Amino acid sequence: MDALIRLFNAPAEPAASVLGGRIAVTSSHLQGLGFIVVKHYSRGGLIKYFIKRRYFKWGKPRCQFEYEVLVKVRGVGVNAPEPVAYAYYGRPFYKAWLVTREIQEPQTLAELSRVDEPHALNVMKAVVEQVTRLIDNHIFHVDLHPGNVLIGKDGGVFLLDFDKARLHGADREKILDKYISRWHRAVTKHRLPGMLSEMMRAGLKRNYDVI
């Protein structure tokens, strides 16, 4: 436990890749836990210049919410990191951490698409199937983009960063449109291969018989 707490206070490794966003993590190997990743919750936007890593506690802390969402999505067959633990400290403003199993030698889909587009397009088939499972269960991943998709060394495809995910009461077609729109914006903004967007749109519409 002491070793894990020390990781909470260790300098985090900022995401250096395209679409890495504000995510900062610490990777380590701890006896009894194995290879893990500690996610340090940090703010984005202008507010980060004033309050970078503290949140006002209103309801569940972010780390607990994401932990529970990961349990849920994995339970319906979505490939997401295995949650191990969560922690937060302070009130009414708190810092938060989430501990998950490490995905070995990961590469984001955004990175892959820039160095091996054919492989990235092949991976998109698995991404579409994962998103389809989310839609089937009315789960909307608000911030899903190619930087939040990891490919492990064994070829496994994982969706990350569910801290802003939510159950959506709308019908599946409306949720589908939200996913397509969010994904397209990210691909366009960061000048990733356009086929990433086209394959997401075509794959989801085909799965739901939408023209």
Annotate each PLM feature.
Residues 3-106, 132, 136:
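Conserved ATP-binding subdomain of kinase catalytic cores across diverse folds
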Residues 38, 142, 160:
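Active-site flanking residues adjacent to catalytic metal/cofactor-binding acidic residues
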Residues 104, 146, 164:
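Short, glycine/acidic-enriched loop or turn micro-motifs at the edges of active sites
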Residues 108-117:
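AlphaC helix of the protein kinase catalytic domain
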Residues 119-130:
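Conserved alphaE helix
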Residues 137, 142-144:
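Residue immediately N-terminal to the catalytic "proton-acceptor" Asp
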Residues 144-151:
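Hydrophobic residue at the +6 position relative to the catalytic HRD Asp in the kinase catalytic loop
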Residues 152, 157-211:
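C-lobe/activation-segment region of protein kinase-like
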